[in-house]
Amino acid sequence: MLTKKTDPMIVSMGPHHPSMHGVLRLVVSLDGENVIDCDPVLGYLHRGMEKIAENRSIVQYLPYVTRWDYLATMFTEAITVNAPEKLANIQVPKRASYIRVIMLELSRIASHLLWLGPFMADIGAQTPFFYIFREREMVYDLFESATGMRMMHNYFRIGGVAVDLPYGWLDKCLDFCDYFLPKIAEYENLITNNPIFRKRVEGIGIISREDAINWGLSGAMLRGSGVQWDLRKVDHYECYDELDWSIQWQSDGDCLARYLVRMGEMRESIKIIQQALKAIPGGPYENLEARRLNEGPKSEWNDFEYQFISKKSSPTFKLPKNEHYVRVEAPKGELGIYLIGDDTVFPWRCKIRPPGFVNLQILPQLVKGMKLADIMTILGSIDIIMGEVDR
């Protein structure tokens, strides 16, 4: 029987494909249903965020940073204020640190929920998509009552947070934690042992421990491959050391392992929030406020311009002639900023290290030899947001 060798078919997936999680284009070479090669095309959402940073003071730049990973905006704000804090050695009051941790973990839950829904929809399960939006709305309600915004919160400031938590907010947050824990169990009962789900994710997109380290992966991509690496434990930032929680990890390295890591992380986040809510101390919520309270009623911080004109010290805050790399454990991995100060209010250089951009590099290697339908499963398990990939 004669067999005719056919040329590979080139298919362009995206940039407006419903499963692309933003404007990503994949140029895929196919032999029948099998993927021979995959070439990601980036840059559709490039806005020059690093260059904008060089022409703005840190406080002016804060509203921009929430547009990188617009589903976990607290983390982009945290890293933007942490960098100048470390650079100029600014102390953050204890209360502010606890408020930050609560906000960061709520943001992590919201991000993981909005990963889970579309990931399941990509695989073909529509129902969880509606479940996760129900719980995510509650997180956004908490954000709205504390910061005034549901997304793009603009809440973090150099030396603390913009405003203190409103009256009754801590109780509302505790109620949410009590409500949400059983919901995670409900998701797991619904999804984890579903035979169709298992067939779509088990043994798909396997990353070995060595590959995960060599490619510089971070977050669930790294911990799903058996590496117990979480920057909250490694870098000891904010007040995570004072709370009792454990790193979530799996050793299989496939899409199922990454799913299990993120489900476990939501549980740990609730645990962290509950402890922080119970242990949160009193006192000032921001560094300038702390100085004002320390110096009493005759302090210059009590003057009209410091009280009412946007807390004057922030807009004219000069970055020392120094350089520093600061990172946080964002929901998608290691989010870092390399900041170089030049003794002016503007940074001389602000290099962003987004987790999505680095994690996406391994995609062509993972999809080679797989079926076309597996591309969506693998891409979904990486969890990218094009806002931070393209910046």
UniProtKB/Swiss-Prot annotation:
Cellular location(s): Plastid, Chloroplast thylakoid membrane
Keywords: Chloroplast, Membrane, NAD, NADP, Plastid, Plastoquinone, Quinone, Thylakoid, Translocase, Transport
Topology within the bilayer: Peripheral membrane protein
Keyword Iron: no
GO BP of this protein: photosynthesis, light reaction
UniProt-listed PROSITE patterns: COMPLEX1_49K
Protein's job: NDH shuttles electrons from NAD(P)H:plastoquinone, via FMN and iron-sulfur (Fe-S) centers, to quinones in the photosynthetic chain and possibly in a chloroplast respiratory chain. The immediate electron acceptor for the enzyme in this species is believed to be plastoquinone. Couples the redox reaction to proton translocation, and thus conserves the redox energy in a proton gradient.
Protein name: NAD(P)H-quinone oxidoreductase subunit H, chloroplastic
Organism annotation: Chaetosphaeridium globosum
UniProt lineage: Eukaryota, Viridiplantae, Streptophyta, Coleochaetophyceae, Coleochaetales
